[in-house]
């Protein structure tokens, strides 16, 4: 079964109905693929929606993700260490949240779906880049 890790930007594209990411989310909802997101990226998603649309909308969208087919992954010891290693390797290029997504994709042997151009240049995992 296909596995994806979704970064914050891709989740935001999904929120606005971007057709480029729709097929990936359809695969998950139909049970043909699995998708994961880190708690850290979910926090980033919440605050970006809160900044633009307010806390009430952020709460609704946050709970929709929690109740969707996306697996929300907590930062356990293995993921935290791997994200730290990635941040050390890509210091100055990738945010800590991006390093968590990258580490999760590596641990899950998943394709990382991202809108981040710097993250798209990394070759640690398979990446599908959606320019914005």
Residue positions per predicted region:
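Short, well-structured N-terminal submotif of metal-dependent ribonuclease cores
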Residues: 1-37, 50-63
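Conserved beta-strand segments of alpha/beta enzyme cores
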Residues: 34, 71, 126-128
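Active-site neighborhoods of divalent-metal-dependent phosphate/nucleic-acid chemistry enzymes
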Residues: 71-113
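Anion (oxyanion) recognition and catalysis
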Residues: 29, 66, 106
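Histidine- and aromatic-rich ligand-binding microenvironments
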Residues: 6-7, 37-38, 94-95, 116, ...
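Acidic, PIN/NYN-like endoribonuclease modules and their adjacent C-terminal/linker elements
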Residues: 1, 102-132
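Alpha-helix capping/helix-boundary segments
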Residues: 10-11, 41-42, 79, 101, ...
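Amphipathic alpha-helical segments within well-ordered protein domains
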Residues: 43-46, 84
């Amino acid at each position: 079964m296909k596995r994806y890790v979704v970064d914050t930007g891709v989740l935001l594209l999904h929120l606005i109905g971007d057709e480029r990411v729709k097929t990936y989310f359809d695969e998950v909802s139909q049970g043909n693929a699995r998708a994961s997101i880190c708690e850290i990226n979910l926090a980033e998603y919440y605050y970006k929606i809160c900044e633009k649309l307010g806390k009430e909308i952020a709460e609704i969208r946050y709970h929709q993700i929690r109740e969707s087919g996306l697996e929300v992954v907590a930062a356990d010891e293995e993921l935290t260490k791997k994200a730290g290693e990635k941040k050390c390797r890509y210091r100055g290029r990738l945010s800590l949240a991006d390093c968590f997504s990258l580490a999760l994709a590596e641990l899950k042997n998943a394709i990382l779906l991202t809108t981040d151009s710097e993250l798209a240049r990394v070759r640690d995992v398979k990446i599908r880049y959606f320019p914005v």
